[in-house]
Design a protein with these regions (language model features):
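Active-site acid/base region of carbohydrate-active enzymes
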Residues: 3-76, 89-140
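Carbohydrate-active enzyme catalytic cores, enriched for enzymes
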Residues: 63, 129-167
Length: 167
């Protein structure tokens, strides 16, 4: 928007959309992080055809699924919100705290993908060099669903470049 308007972006729009996105982000954090460990599952991303089964439905065997793509998407969402908050904070420093909040969310999510809970389970498989969904069975066992699909690539989308003028 800035490039098309002589270096001046639509901050009013950016603030409005930030608050709507904040509501959606909060919904994901509160309702789709089943274990409270910054690993997400059970949400419809509009990409549910990339898994090997319907991940919006309950598992027929019980247990639950922790989704590499849903978690990676939330990491990316955190970085997108960080970027928007930094942009708004240029003129309204109140948003600096929000930028910090989303940076912390990103760090927690990225860390959780490498060490889930006290068992230190990973969505990343070091041998395969790939992310996988993790199936948590009702008996407490957990295993990676080693299917190479888009599921394992989505976490790689969580990248952001912050320029010095935004910091």
């Amino acid at each position: 928007d800035k490039e098309m308007n002589g270096g001046k972006g639509d901050r009013v729009f950016l603030e409005r959309i930030f608050h709507k996105l904040l509501l959606n982000f909060t919904w994901w954090v509160n309702l789709k992080d089943e274990g409270g460990n910054n690993i997400f599952g059970g949400g419809f991303l509009g990409m549910d055809n990339i898994g090997v089964f319907d991940r919006s439905a309950a598992l027929p065997t019980g247990g639950h699924l922790e989704q590499a793509d849903g978690t990676g998407w939330m990491a990316m969402y955190s970085l997108n919100m960080l970027r928007i908050a930094c942009e708004i904070a240029i003129e309204n420093p109140v948003y600096q705290d929000m930028a910090s909040k989303f940076f912390e969310h990103f760090l927690h999510i990225a860390g959780a993908m490498q060490a889930i809970g006290g068992d230190k389970l990973n969505l990343w498989d070091e041998d395969d060099q790939f992310y996988y969904d993790m199936l948590h069975k009702e008996n407490g066992e957990a295993e990676l669903l080693k299917v190479r699909s888009m599921v394992g690539l989505i976490p790689l989308f969580a990248v952001e470049v912050l320029t010095p003028e935004l910091l």
